[in-house]
């Protein structure tokens, strides 16, 4: 059986793993491809410490983002209801529909915080009334907001 070499990946490689992973590869693969192209580094105690520090920083940053998402979720629930004005025909049906972009604009106007419209799920809204939209603020944090559609 051939000897394997342990390397630390400096970028994600689909067949091996993601950045920062320690993997064992064939010596030729490491020597001829991974190391010369900067896709991996030889494992040394200094490299291990560097990877550990980087993972700690990433964890702190991820925790901070999650806390910001939780705070924004609380702010959204405190506001309660967002009003969207749309034109209505004589039969009470909207001209067009309420889109996730409309909801994002209403939230941005009320909270002064930008939100990506692609993270908002809105039911099909063709009439006036109250509806609920779902927002993905973070992979672990979701929020629901009430929308009031008026003319």
Curated annotation (Swiss-Prot):
UniProtKB keywords: Ribonucleoprotein, Ribosomal protein, RNA-binding, rRNA-binding
PROSITE patterns: RIBOSOMAL_L9
Pfam families membership: Ribosomal_L9_C (PF03948), Ribosomal_L9_N (PF01281)
Any one Gene Ontology BP term: translation
PANTHER family for the chain: 50S RIBOSOMAL PROTEIN L9
Protein family membership: Belongs to the bacterial ribosomal protein bL9 family.
Name of the featured protein: Large ribosomal subunit protein bL9
Protein source organism: Prochlorococcus marinus (strain MIT 9312)
Gene coding for it: rplI2
């Amino acid at each position: 059986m051939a000897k394997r070499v342990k390397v630390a990946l400096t970028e994600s490689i689909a067949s091996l793993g993601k950045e920062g992973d320690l993997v064992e590869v064939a010596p030729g693969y490491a020597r001829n491809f991974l190391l010369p192209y900067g896709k991996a580094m030889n494992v040394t105690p200094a490299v291990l410490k560097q990877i550990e520090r980087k993972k700690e920083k990433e964890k702190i940053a991820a925790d901070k983002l999650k806390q910001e998402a939780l705070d924004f979720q609380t702010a959204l629930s405190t506001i309660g209801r967002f009003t969207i004005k749309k034109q209505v025909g004589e039969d009470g049906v909207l001209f067009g529909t309420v889109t996730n972009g409309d909801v994002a604009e209403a939230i941005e106007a009320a909270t002064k915080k930008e939100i990506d419209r692609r993270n908002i799920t809105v039911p099909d809204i063709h009439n006036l009334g109250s509806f609920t939209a779902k927002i993905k603020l973070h992979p672990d944090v979701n929020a629901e907001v009430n929308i009031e559609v008026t003319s």
